């Protein structure tokens, strides 16, 4: 039977040829036939190996196992033996290395707020568990200064919770009324008067002193709120008046043609409308202005006549009537424009 070296390709070729060869008889040398009997050596038949076994024998020495021993990394190698049964009955069990790379786990600091009790053993196990870096909380850092400050805060909170809280003083209606009367007499109570009130109302001097302090603060808050309200009302009134004054100035600066156009539009029928001042002829605009001025003068004179009617002489009344008639002759009537 031939022996092979798996590390050299030449022996591999010889191994392939020998595995595919048929069993033959090996003749003895001629010198041996004369003196010794003939011994026939038959080669043991071999089945062809599987490709897996073949390449493992050829390149198995090149495979190296790498173990990464970094801090925090866990390399779990599971070795499974997979025996391969060939047709010839020879069992081979190559060692196959399977590396399972896991996510590196970083220990997370746990904080014990209170002393652990036996009932919370499960919670303690959860607190000591490790978390991946993606789930880390930046607020809880491992800085000793932050931990010391947090511990001091918890200690102050425990002391504050353990301290008995002072109860709020509740005054009766009679006590409140008596104190209000005294406050309206004088906002700052003297020591002798405070002692008398404490004896009368069955309160301590400290309670009466604090009540007067709170009452003065309340008066200041009310006074400030009233001042703010007056200021807001003043600002609103000024803004309203400025708005009104702005509208009045705009109305007085508007041309007199707008009033004439409005009068003409009010007098129009269904088939007539008032033209804009830009489209009206200059003569019509001038006539409208003169009519406006004359109308204002007539109204003013009429009011003056009513006021001084008992002082005016009959001759003067006739003269005024004649002047009004002459003015009415020169004032043309408003002209209407037909759009059809």
UniProtKB/Swiss-Prot annotation:
A GO BP entry: positive regulation of transcription by RNA polymerase II
Annotated PROSITE patterns: HOMEOBOX_1, HOMEOBOX_2
Protein name according to UniProt: Homeobox protein rough
DNA-binding region: 164-223
GO CC list: nucleus
Pro residues: bias regions: 331-340
Residue ranges with Low complexity bias: 18-37, 314-325
SMART domains the UniProt entry points to: HOX (SM00389)
One Pfam family of this chain: Homeodomain
Gene3D superfamilies associated with the record: Homeodomain-like
Residues covered by region (Disordered): 1-51, 64-96, 300-340
InterPro entries reported for this sequence: HD, HD_metazoa, Homeobox_CS, Homeobox_TF, Homeodomain-like_sf
Function: Required to establish the unique cell identity of photoreceptors R2 and R5 and consequently for ommatidial assembly in the developing eye imaginal disk. Repression of expression in R8 photoreceptor by senseless (sens) is an essential mechanism of R8 cell fate determination.
Gene name as annotated: ro
Source organism (scientific name): Drosophila virilis
GO molecular function: DNA-binding transcription factor activity, RNA polymerase II-specific; RNA polymerase II transcription regulatory region sequence-specific DNA binding
Recorded coiled-coil stretches: none
Keywords for this protein: Developmental protein, DNA-binding, Homeobox, Nucleus, Sensory transduction, Vision
């Amino acid at each position: 039977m031939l022996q092979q070296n798996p590390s050299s390709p030449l022996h591999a070729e010889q191994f392939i040829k020998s595995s595919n060869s048929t069993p033959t008889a090996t003749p003895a040398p001629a010198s041996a036939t004369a003196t010794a009997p003939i011994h026939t050596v038959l080669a043991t038949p071999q089945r062809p190996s599987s490709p897996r076994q073949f390449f493992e024998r050829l390149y198995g020495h090149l495979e190296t196992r790498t173990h990464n021993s970094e801090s925090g990394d866990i390399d779990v190698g599971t070795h499974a033996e997979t025996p391969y049964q060939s047709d010839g009955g020879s069992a081979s069990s190559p060692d196959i290395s399977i590396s399972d790379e896991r996510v590196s786990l970083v220990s997370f600091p746990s904080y014990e707020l209170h002393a652990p009790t036996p009932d919370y053993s499960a919670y303690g196990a959860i607190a000591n568990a490790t978390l991946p870096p993606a789930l880390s909380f930046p607020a809880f850092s491992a800085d000793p200064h932050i931990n010391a400050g947090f511990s001091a805060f918890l200690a102050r909170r425990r002391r504050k919770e353990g301290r008995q809280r002072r109860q709020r003083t509740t005054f009766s209606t009679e006590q409140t009324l008596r104190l209000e009367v005294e406050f309206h007499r004088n906002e700052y109570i003297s020591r002798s008067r405070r002692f008398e009130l404490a004896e009368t109302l069955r309160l301590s001097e400290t309670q009466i002193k604090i009540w007067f302090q709170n009452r003065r603060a309340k008066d200041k808050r009310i006074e400030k709120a009233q001042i703010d309200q007056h200021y807001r009302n003043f600002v609103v009134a000024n803004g309203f008046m400025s708005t009104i004054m702005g509208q009045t100035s705009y109305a007085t600066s508007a041309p007199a043609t707008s009033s004439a156009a409005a009068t003409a539009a009010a007098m129009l029928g269904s088939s007539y409308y008032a033209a804009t001042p830009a489209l009206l002829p200059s003569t019509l605009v001038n006539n409208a202005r003169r009519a406006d001025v004359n109308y204002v003068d007539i109204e003013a004179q009429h009011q003056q006549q009513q006021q001084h009617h008992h002082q005016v002489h009959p001759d003067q009344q006739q003269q005024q009537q004649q002047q009004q008639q002459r003015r009415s002759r020169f004032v043309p009537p408003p002209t209407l424009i037909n759009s059809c």
